[in-house]
């Protein structure tokens, strides 16, 4: 027991010795002078070179009003409005808060004595320029991803969105800065498959009765190999048939819409063309009605070709020789006797001119008869036409036009009464001729009259005998 008691006493004495030699902790108050080669003890203190003392800093929200010296510590004061100090400092003044946030920014932290104002961009924009305090100075709109592209989960370093192409099985049909690629619709009956920019289109699960007969035209052909009759179509064939059913009405609708436009255009153009033709015809008819009635003054006789005229001459000659051989001679006699009886005395110049013209006409007829007897031994007819053209409404006083036909035969003798033939009046002998009437005579030297069928082969009449008569009258 003795050694144990000794050991307890020894330990107790050692504890008392340790307690007596301990140094109490010292609290250093500012200002104080640091030991050579050492700095101030804590971060809330600073070394004043002028006083060569360690002095206390001002807490956040305050600034240094008076610096320390060898006998007194630093004196601090609170910051004014719209000013702040955020850390322990030895500033002479507080810092100014940032300006108010713009319209495209949102204030996420207000200005106080201990902190600055912080602004952030509103939704749809990103910060293009930041300050050291974390506030945004300039905001810009986020980029938009078009159809076929979606917004990636990560952002660019400046906060702008990143676009990525939609993977197979997904799509994006919008232009947005927030939409991501969405998966395609899952259809039990697929009508139109989807792609990166459009979603899949599903066919109706219960087809209508009108679409059922179309399965005969759009269904896939059966395999050529023989199969049992009781075998039912597999599940792979049904979707293809129903898919074509769903797509058939869409094709027909687009076809009808495409055909209706050309038909309407063609009908409109045709109607416009017919209307224009009708207007042109009406204008032409109105212009024709306005023209005067007397326009054509030249008597035209159709010309018969040589080949047809030769055949017609033979038939005419045979017909005239058999029917009226004596009538032609009588017409010649009547014309001659009428000229002798109606010849006036020499004292009247107009009568003398008519007599000379009648004698010249008889001489010309006799010469034609002699020429025809030596040449072709046939019957020839000479036609002289006097045409009166008048547009006046007064038809009571018009001179009668006369056509004399002379048929010659070398053996015939004139035997006819002068009463059967009338002597034509000259222009001066027409007493009741109205001013509107004009007499035009077909002259051989200006416009030769085409010979008729009976006149083929005859010699043309002597040119200029009407001119000679006109000279004598003058």
UniProtKB/Swiss-Prot annotation:
Residues 324-338, 363-378 have a biased composition (Low complexity). It is a single-pass type I membrane protein. Disulfide bonds join 40-54, 55-68, 58-76, 79-94, 97-111, 101-119, 121-127, 136-145, 139-163, 166-181. Residues 220-243, 295-314, 321-378, 397-463 are annotated as: Disordered. Residues 297-310 have a biased composition (Basic and acidic residues). GO terms for cellular component: membrane; membrane raft. Residues 289-474 are cytoplasmic. Residues 429-442 have a biased composition (Polar residues). It is found in: Membrane. One of its GO terms (molecular function) is ubiquitin protein ligase binding. Keywords: Disulfide bond, Glycoprotein, Membrane, Phosphoprotein, Receptor, Repeat, Signal, Transmembrane, Transmembrane helix. Residues 23-258 are extracellular. TNFR-Cys repeats lie at residues 39-77, 78-119, 120-164, 165-203. InterPro entries: TNF_chemokine_rcpt-like, TNFR/NGFR_Cys_rich_reg, TNFR_1B, TNFRSF1B_N. Glycans are attached at residues 30, 69, 195, 208, 224. Residues 1-22 form the signal peptide. The modification Phosphoserine is found at residue 331. The chain crosses the membrane at residues 259-288. Binds to TRAF2. Interacts with BMX. Interacts (activated form) with XPNPEP3. Receptor with high affinity for TNFSF2/TNF-alpha and approximately 5-fold lower affinity for homotrimeric TNFSF1/lymphotoxin-alpha. The TRAF1/TRAF2 complex recruits the apoptotic suppressors BIRC2 and BIRC3 to TNFRSF1B/TNFR2. This is Tumor necrosis factor receptor superfamily member 1B.
């Amino acid at each position: 027991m003795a050694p144990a008691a000794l050991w307890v006493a020894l330990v107790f004495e050692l504890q008392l010795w340790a307690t007596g030699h301990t140094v109490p902790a010292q609290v250093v108050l500012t200002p104080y002078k640091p030991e050579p080669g050492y700095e101030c003890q804590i971060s809330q203190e600073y070394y004043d070179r002028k006083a060569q003392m360690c002095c206390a800093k001002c807490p956040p929200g305050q600034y240094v009003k008076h610096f320390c010296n060898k006998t007194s510590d630093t004196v601090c004061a609170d910051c004014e409005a719209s000013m702040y100090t955020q850390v322990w400092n030895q500033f002479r003044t507080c810092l100014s808060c940032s300006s108010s946030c713009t319209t495209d920014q949102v204030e996420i932290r207000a200005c106080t004595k201990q902190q600055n104002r912080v602004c952030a961009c509103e939704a749809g924009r990103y910060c293009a320029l930041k300050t050291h305090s974390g506030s945004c100075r300039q905001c810009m709109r986020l980029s938009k991803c078009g159809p076929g592209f979606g917004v990636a989960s990560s952002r660019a370093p400046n906060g702008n969105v990143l676009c990525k192409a939609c993977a197979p099985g997904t799509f994006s049909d919008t232009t947005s800065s927030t939409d991501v690629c969405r998966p395609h619709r899952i259809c039990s009956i697929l009508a139109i498959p989807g792609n990166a920019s459009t979603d899949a289109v599903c066919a109706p699960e219960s087809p209508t009765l009108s679409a059922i007969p179309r399965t005969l035209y759009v269904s896939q052909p059966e395999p050529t190999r023989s199969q049992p009759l009781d075998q039912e179509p597999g599940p792979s064939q049904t979707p293809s048939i129903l898919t074509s059913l769903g797509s058939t009405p869409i094709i027909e609708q687009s076809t009808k819409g495409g055909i209706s436009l050309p038909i309407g255009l063609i009908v409109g153009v045709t109607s416009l063309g017919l209307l224009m033709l009708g207007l042109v015809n009406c204008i032409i008819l109105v212009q024709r009605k306005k023209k005067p009635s007397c326009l054509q003054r030249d008597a035209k006789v159709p010309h018969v070709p040589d080949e047809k005229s030769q055949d017609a001459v033979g038939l005419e000659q045979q017909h005239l020789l058999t029917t009226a051989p004596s009538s032609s001679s009588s017409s010649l006699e009547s014309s001659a006797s009428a000229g002798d009886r109606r010849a006036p005395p020499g004292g009247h110049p107009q009568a003398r001119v008519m007599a000379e013209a009648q004698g010249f006409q008889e001489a010309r007829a006799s010469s034609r008869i002699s020429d025809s007897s030596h040449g072709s031994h046939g019957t020839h007819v000479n036609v002289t036409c006097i045409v009166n053209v008048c547009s006046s409404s007064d038809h009571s006083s018009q001179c009668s036009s006369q056509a004399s036909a002379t048929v010659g035969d070398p053996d015939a003798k004139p035997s006819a009464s002068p009463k059967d033939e009338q002597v034509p009046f000259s222009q001066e002998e027409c007493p009741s001729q109205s001013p509107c009437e004009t007499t035009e005579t077909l002259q051989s030297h200006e416009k030769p009259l085409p010979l008729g069928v009976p006149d083929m082969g005859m010699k043309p009449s002597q040119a200029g005998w009407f001119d000679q008569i006109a000279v004598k009258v003058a």
